[in-house]
Amino acid sequence: MTRYFCCGNYFPGYPCYGTNFHGTYRATPLNCVVPLGSPLNHGCGTMYSSRNFCYGGISNFSNPGCCYGSSLYRPWGSGSGFGYSTY
């Protein structure tokens, strides 16, 4: 399985809290949709999280704009998340 990183440096390379494509809260690396070496890693280092949340309640506190739905960094355009498979 491809390793994915989450938003921020809090738990790099480890499971983080976020929403999957179904909108449910999970603590699993499957929520992280941007792999290492991705050209989209600008904006907040190499850490991205899925959808609109990082670590659940902490949100973008540490790295504003590095999550899906952000108004600051959204290099993927729509930010829907689809197009970067978590499976």
From Swiss-Prot:
This is Keratin-associated protein 7-1. Interacts with hair keratins. Keywords: Keratin, Repeat. Pfam families: KRTAP7. Residues 37-84 are annotated as: 8 X 2 AA repeats of G-[YCGS]. GO terms for cellular component: intermediate filament. The keyword Isomerase does not apply. It comes from the Eukaryota. It comes from Mus musculus (Mouse). In the hair cortex, hair keratin intermediate filaments are embedded in an interfilamentous matrix, consisting of hair keratin-associated proteins (KRTAP), which are essential for the formation of a rigid and resistant hair shaft through their extensive disulfide bond cross-linking with abundant cysteine residues of hair keratins. The matrix proteins include the high-sulfur and high-glycine-tyrosine keratins. The keyword Repeat applies. InterPro entries: KRTAP7. Transmembrane segments: none annotated. Belongs to the KRTAP type 7 family.
